Amino acid sequence: VVNAKPERLLFLAFPLSILYSFLRFIPPFRKLLQMDKIIKAYSQCDIVIDEAGISFVDSRGFIMNTYAFVCAAVPMLCGVPVVKYSQALGTFKNGWNKFLAKWILPKIKLICARGKITQDNLAGIGVTENVKLCADGAFSMPDSEFYAEKVQKLCEDSPFFRKRVVALSISSVVQGKCEKMGRDYRGCMIQFINWLNEQDYNVLLIANAAREGSEKPRNNDLIICTEVYN
């Protein structure tokens, strides 16, 4: 495991990878640049698989899209091919995002487009030759009999699951969008859950993204789930 925090990747590894792309054929310089753990790790790989669930999306803004660019650029500058595992990309209406995407994505060895919309977004900026339409990786994984049995036993032993159950995925992303529209997302979810309870349903709250111990809402639905539950 190599420490590749965003600031370290952007301000240290990225400049070094540019130098490495020119100097890696000269043994003394290659050895010197490989003193950086990120450069050394990437340069020893046969292939790098980018497992971002979503990247190069207008709504993610300058910082996140720049980070997505650097994540792909550093290993490529180290001479290692990059494959983008099944993920969502686009839209590309923002100028900076479109510039970065058009520059780096055609150079990716293979882009697994997660769904037809992503494929169309990529085609809209002329990226087609290295794109393959794929399903979501998580939904393509085989079920584990071991965990399926554990879940089944949990459901059988818990009184909660002896009634009809509705699972509700509370989203911090949707909450943020509702706030911009002046809508009370938390209140709406509470009202909906109360109605389900009145119809004799138990409600199971699911945090799609969870960062235990974090008080920040990004990639963390635990906060809004807790607010709704309380």
Please place each PLM-identified region on the residue numbering.
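Active-site anion-handling motifs in enzyme catalytic cores
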Residues: 1-230
